[in-house]
Swiss-Prot record:
The modification Pyrrolidone carboxylic acid is found at residue 1. The keyword Transcription does not apply. It is found in: Secreted. Disulfide bonds: none annotated. The keyword Secreted applies. This is Tachykinin-like peptide-III. Belongs to the tachykinin family. It comes from the Eukaryota. It comes from Phoneutria nigriventer.
Length: 8
């Protein structure tokens, strides 16, 4: 699963 930059 890739984490989006919005997951910050």
């Amino acid at each position: 699963q890739k984490k989006d930059k919005k997951d910050r």
